[in-house]
Amino acid sequence: MNLSELLIELLLMPLVAFVIGLGMVLMMRKIAARLGRRIGPPLLQPIYDIIKLYGKRTQISHGLIHEIGIIMAVGGYVAAETLLPVPGMNGLADKGGVITLAYVMMIPSLGMALGVGQCANPNGSIGISRALTAMLAYDIPFILVIFGAAYVYGTTNLADIIAIQQQQGVSGWGLMQMPLLALAGMLALPAVMGKQPFEIYIAPAEIATGPMVEMSGKFMGGLFVMQCFQLYTAGVLYTTLFLGGGAYWITFLPKIYAVVAIPMAAAMLFPRYRTEDVIRLMWKWPVLVGLMGLAVAMK
Amino acid sequence: MSKDLNIWLDDLLGDIENIQFKRKSSRRVRVDVGSEALPALLELLQGRASYVHLSAISCVDWIEDEEFELVYHVWSYETRSLVSAHTRIPREPGVYLSIYDLYQPAAFFERDIHEMFGVFFEGSPDMEKFILTEWDGPPPMRKEFDSEAFVNQHFEWEQYHPQWLKDLEEEGGGVTTRPEDIRL
Amino acid sequence: MSKLDNIPVRHQPTEAAGRKRTNPLAHVFDELVKFCQSRSMFMLHYCTGCGAIELPPAMTSRFDMERLGIQPMVTPRQADILLITGYVSIKTLKRIILTYEQMQSPKYVIGICSCTVNGGMYWQSYATAKVLKDYLPVDVYIAGCMPRPEAVISGMRELMSDIKSGRAQNWKRYYENYDHYLGNQQKLFGEDWQTPTDIIAEARHYGLMTDRTLGEHTALLEKHQRPLEALEMRLSAREKQKT
Amino acid sequence: MRPENYQARSQPPSNEFELNFGPNHPGIEGNYAFRVKLNGDQVLEARADAGYLHRGFEKLMEGRLWIQNIALVPRICVPDPVPMEVCYSLAIEEIGGLEVPERAKWIRVMQLEMSRLAAHLFAFGGHAATTGMYTTMFWGVADRDLILDRFEELTGGRVYSIYNIPGGVRRDVPEGFLDRLSSLLDYLESRLPDYDNLFFTNQVFVKRARGVGAMTQEQALKWGVTGPNLRATGLEFDVRRDDPYLVYDQLDFEIPTESGGDALARNLVRRAELKQSIRILRQVIERLPSIEGPIRCPIPNPLAWNVPAGEAYTRVESSKGELAYYVVSTGGDKPYRVHVRGPSSMHAVQVLEKLALGARLEDIAQIMFSLDACPPEVDR
């Protein structure tokens, strides 16, 4: 692969991720609306929101760290997108691998913590401390699932993982090979995406939307963009590990949307857990299922 | 039941002096009592007659008599009747005893009356401003406070005088409604 | 109370002063932003009065405001629309002004219910402010006691079309006529009324300073200037009085 | 205020901090505020701050005619306005010695129960939203809207009906109204299992709400708790049955109780009351056509009506608890004094302050919404 092709891919991959992520945000809001017997927002609503937020006249910044925090939050995901292979584009997937990805996916939360800390709003601080605790909760099953999958496939290279699965057709998918690990991943997925019942860190009725409380204008817009990436990353990673990745966009897109839609639909049927219940739940069931899956995989 | 209640209350209240007792209906009893005897009456009602629920304390400003009337409505879950104990205190200086030790809900009502009428209750746990924290005029519920005059003095209204109103006024003003059109 | 008679009610859109738009695409961008602003309105989740009871029906399944891109937001920082749902008591009005000044421009105020127009049925009440537009620039009034959800949504659509065509510029009036609004506020809250937001500096920043921004009332700001204090919190009053 | 004056306050290092909870906060019902002192997540002290909705109702009513006040009273409690009108009318009827026709009494009961249904749907929808379950809120508010449609048909007003006047009600029941009401009740009853599955038996919700804001029966009696909140502590008491007004003594209904005294129990009591209200409404639908007669007794010209001197204390059971009016007349055309005892004046102030102590930050909103506190009743 020559340098110019790589550069184009690096540019294109986050862009594609953003567009698909917008669709996921729309889908999330539509699902919430349909379950609530509503019609829901129009087709382009997510992009309207983002353009509007960037077009605000007043942009209140709380200082350099505040801005850097948002850049880290978005940038962390942009970096993650280049590590995630999609049909036709591998980006840095060959070089990085799933371990780098797992590290990179923690950067946004830390960036948010930095930015929110600068705002000095107690609601934000409480929210971000809850968010980091929730990250601690879901990271154990998340890492467990990733390592289990890497062990089974014998590689941490995501492009190779896709190739291995596709050689054997549907029966070669991770879902068939290691159903327990796939189940553990599915259980942890709502927490990775930050949806009910694991979203107490943004509970509006308690801490006025927590970390977002002082975010406005382009900072809020940045968080909206981050949400697109967040949903996309979770969907694509799960698809890559367990659903055979994508050879063609036409099979890849339904898979990632379905992966995101399942936790979304469940989320609207549950209230929030308390923080300690999140940890208890996350360290109990997904970890237990994941460990069993690991044991089965190792024999 | 109501007759028993009457006799029973008569017995109970017999040993308090300066008390008038009137049964309004089977579940409503009015008691007029001197201000010095009211706490004792309430203590009796609560301790010996199971009137444990203080429904409300109402204050009425009888400006012509220079008096505040305090009405304590207490309810018994057992006899299912409500006793309204009326007492009067002089308007000046407007100080009375708190019954917080007997009935905890009194704290809210006493705070409210203090705020709205300026009656101070000795022994009440909290006499701070609550609703009118940003009001520095006289206690507004006193009869001498004229809300309308205050508003006219402090606020201005939108000058609303459209053409159709002017036309109406030229014609002699007022909207005429035929008697058969008046509906309640 | 100073009068607003000599000031036009709606401004023609003025070019941002001090900045020349040379980019030929700037106009296109402006139009795009305006369109998106009209299609994505975040309203502040603040029930100031009884009209708020008709907002849940307007937001939920029956009338579904999200169809129009309107959704509630929690903090003033993120909101575009301040809905004044009904009468404003003086205590609430202070909070409303604080909230309004913290919102990010462009921002819009919608006065719902008759009480925001002229005091409504509480005209003789000592505790409510009567004419909302004396204290804040109001973009749209929705009259009624209380307006039905359809009326609320229709008022929102009115505001949407105003934003799209660029007529809804009332937020600029707050900067341009700050002295007038501050004067009315001071009349109600006392001379030493101050808010933590520096409106004058913001007006200078946006190039919205006029000769009506500064005046006798803003001079009082300097006079009564005092350091920012935390809101007084007397939690232990109860224990203190007891002892 | 100039930016150069923004100064960070120096505070001694401490785990404790203060937080303003409201008035502009989605965890607050209406326009109300709390100041809480927290240690980490735990509330050390809480103090209610009311008055944001103060309009001086009691003062305003002294300046208006008896009949004009009918338009004023429903505004005191916005989600559940009908008991206000009825209670005020009952007081005037008691002072003036008016004999309300039988038919009017039944129509009033019908209205009261419709209002209770609407208020309860709103209340637990709101509670669900504080715990992050917006679907229940969407459903609850939408179903409440169907009841408002029936109100509109009956009275002409969606929220504030201004339909009860001293001496009876303003209009007779429209033709076919009872059939439509009946089919609405069928619909609501068919929805109840859905609500059960979605919300009341949802394990996440049960886990969240159990033990939150719990009080014992002794505490509840001591603090002046009334209504569903009192019944959630196990005391079977209802003003409708134990201090009957209108025709509640002729109706057959149960008083649901729970023993927990916590947020969950309070919601379950409301859930059970929905069923009882539907049951009462069905009885009304059955009996109303057979009760002939006028819908109001003749009253003098209301614009020049001098209600005879006297005083009355009337109580009704609103959806929040015991609602009472103390009305004094000196024989004039205006009331001399009206005192409103809103149920939330206890629940939203003292009870909430006490229950919040030791609770956690995430539970304050739940406690407030489970008590169904209505701030305008406090502020008046």
Enumerate the predicted regions with their spans.
Chain D
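Active-site bordering "gate/hinge" segments
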Residues: 1-380
